[in-house]
């Protein structure tokens, strides 16, 4: 414990230039950077949302297309809506079909609706 107290005392007596030199030497010795963690965290926190891949998607029915009956059937199967509700949804496009879906689920729904003749987009 006495050795640590001596090190603390020696570090406390360093001038600003000596402390900067010590910092550079330790960076080289240990292969690290003495960048301020707060600044790095703030920059990383600001950049993180842009870099992160979106995990939740909204499946939007843009247009029912020429084969509305097939699209209505598919909407009913995907959402569990009744015939009238599904018909109103398709005819009232653009409307969300599913909100907060995972990427895989959203892609699956999109491909099923497009196969039925609808125009769909993910947001």
Swiss-Prot record:
Pfam families: Ribosomal_L12, Ribosomal_L12_N
GO cellular component, one term: cytoplasm
UniProt-listed Gene3D superfamilies: 3.30.1390.10, Single helix bin
GO BP of this protein: translation
GO function terms (MF aspect): mRNA binding; structural constituent of ribosome
Family: Belongs to the bacterial ribosomal protein bL12 family.
Protein name: Large ribosomal subunit protein bL12
Provenance organism: Bartonella tribocorum (strain CIP 105476 / IBS 506)
UniProt gene name: rplL
């Amino acid at each position: 414990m006495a050795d640590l107290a001596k090190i603390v005392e020696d570090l406390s007596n360093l001038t600003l230039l000596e402390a900067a030199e010590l910092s550079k030497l330790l960076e080289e010795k240990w292969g690290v950077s003495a960048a301020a963690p707060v600044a790095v965290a703030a920059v990383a926190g600001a950049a993180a949302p842009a870099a992160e891949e979106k995990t939740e998607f909204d499946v939007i029915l843009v247009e029912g297309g020429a084969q509305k009956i097939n699209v209505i059937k598919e909407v009913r199967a995907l959402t569990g809506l009744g015939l009238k509700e599904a018909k109103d949804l398709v005819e009232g496009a653009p409307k969300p079909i599913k909100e907060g879906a995972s990427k895989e689920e959203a892609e699956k729904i999109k491909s099923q609706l497009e196969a039925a003749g609808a125009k769909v987009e993910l947001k």
